[in-house]
Regions:
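N-terminal nucleotide-binding beta1-loop-alpha1 segment
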Residues: 1-19
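Structural signal for interior beta-strand "rungs" in well-ordered beta-sheet cores
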Residues: 246-308
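A short, conserved acidic/glycine-rich loop-to-beta-strand motif
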Residues: 127-137
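Generic preference for hydrophobic
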Residues: 3, 25, 77-78, 158, ...
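Conserved N-terminal catalytic core of the sugar/cofactor nucleotidyltransferase
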Residues: 1-5, 29-108, 117-119, 298-308
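Catalytic-core segments of class I nucleotidyltransferases/pyrophosphorylases
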Residues: 103-105, 112, 118-125, 138-141, ...
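Active-site metal-binding loops of divalent metal-dependent hydrolases
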Residues: 10, 109-111
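Hydrophobic packing residues within well-ordered alpha-helices of enzyme cores
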Residues: 14, 60-64, 231
């Protein structure tokens, strides 16, 4: 199996943060989104991965190389220019690297999760659908486009497109296992969407796509300022069961941070490298990300890096 992490998005919902930092490089305490996703790939036993990049591609490439080396992954970079190619076009551009008769693990680069994906992979290998979409129960009031599945777990519709039948709506996690037949459905040039142009096309041809529901574990689409804030605070409190991600019981201060001796630090709190904290209260439940500056009280929140 080979994996691909989609890391070429513009991160428009996270501006102005993403004007200087690409979304996959956004800090999550001492890590980044991209590093967490590459670690997820490695935990599944995958040893080869493609990472695409477009916006601030040099930063994405630098993090990907460092993390892949640390995790023992063979890395391929797929640089998209002059425009990002979407989730489908990214696969087409990287097809020479991906299309080798193996299952492809594809995941969105803005997902943070501790879900155990092994049962989904085992089911995909046993049932051999064209694709297996990893799903979550749909939260009440959520504004995500639904993926509807029948009682056997077969996908009927994606965002209302597909085939007839009575289905139950679920939330797509941004993670799927694919066979190369999916790539055959995508336009050979330009941007495209794997779900709307790949999966929906297969559904209309009567091909089987599986929806595997995982209710356990935590999952977040870290694509908005509020969800990015929540992800950092959840990591601070150890709510994600990830290796090396135990709760911060006290106060962590990086040796590279500068903290005023008059600052009042209250646990739990995390202060990253390059951060500066003045003579103010910080905590409880405070995350000061690398390069951030705090000159006013901070509690139950996240201080972001300066963008000047």
């Amino acid at each position: 199996m080979i994996a691909m992490v989609l890391a070429a998005g513009l991160g428009t919902r996270l501006r102005p943060l993403t004007e200087k930092i690409p979304k996959p490089a956004l800090p999550l305490l001492g890590s980044t989104l991209l590093e967490e996703n590459l670690a997820l790939v490695a935990r599944l036993g995958v040893r080869e991965v493609v990472v695409n990049a477009h916006h601030l591609a040099d930063q994405v490439a630098r993090i990907a190389r460092s993390a892949a080396d640390r995790l023992g992954l063979k890395l391929h970079l797929s640089i998209e220019s002059p425009e990002p190619l979407g989730t489908g076009g990214a696969l087409v551009a990287a097809r020479p690297l991906l299309d080798r008769g193996e299952t492809i693990l594809l995941l969105n680069g803005d997902v943070l999760t501790d879900m155990d994906l092994r049962p989904a992979l085992e089911r995909h290998r046993a049932e051999r659908p064209a694709a297996t979409m990893v799903l979550r129960p749909m939260p009440a009031g959520a504004d995500f486009a639904p993926v509807e599945i029948d009682r056997e777990g077969a996908v009927l519709r994606i965002a209302g497109l597909g085939r007839e039948g009575e289905g139950v709506p679920h939330l797509f996690s941004g993670i799927h296992f694919l066979e190369s037949v999916v790539l055959d459905e995508l336009p050979t040039e330009g941007p495209s969407c794997i779900n709307r142009q790949g999966h929906v096309s297969l559904l209309r041809k009567g091909k089987r796509i599986l929806g595997h529901v995982i209710a356990d574990g935590r999952w977040s689409d870290v694509g908005t300022p509020e969800r990015y804030r929540e992800a950092n605070l959840d990591l601070l409190e150890g709510r994600y069961e990830l290796p090396g991600r135990e709760a911060i019981r006290g106060v962590f201060v990086s040796p590279e941070a500068k903290v005023s001796p008059e600052a009042e630090l209250r646990a739990p709190a995390w202060i990253g490298p390059g951060a500066r904290v003045g003579a103010v209260p910080v905590g409880p439940r405070a995350v000061v990300l690398p390069g951030a500056r705090v000159e006013a009280p901070l509690a139950d929140g996240v201080a972001y890096p300066e963008l000047g």
